[in-house]
Amino acid sequence: MSEAIVYLASSAIIKLIFDEPETPALAEFLVEWPNRLCSTLGRVEVLRISRRVGDAVVTRHAREILTGVHLVRADEGILAAAAALEQPTLRTLDSIHLATALSLGPDLAGMVVYDRQLREAARAAGLNVWAPT
């Protein structure tokens, strides 16, 4: 197993909560990556989506999934870095995810993301990007 860190964007975490076509491949991929991180923003996104789309059981399952993900606080440095990203079409929340991932430095092996714009921005920033299917 790898000691390196993998960053999970909200789009990846959601696929662990809801049964989607990519869920089995993602779950298998993550077996090799026990060190999983996401922004605290991701927790908010995931729980809001769980409440909007699911019920109390889904929200409880989302909380269980999130216990396996270390959350990185979106501090002033990360927010400033997100605001300074060059990609003009990158949405605000996605820029925070990307800035958080970039803040991890050389310990970051890559980012798991299913959102096309964020995936392209992460690649442009030089990150390894995965979207297991």
Model regions and ranges:
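Acidic catalytic patch
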Residues: 67-88, 94-100
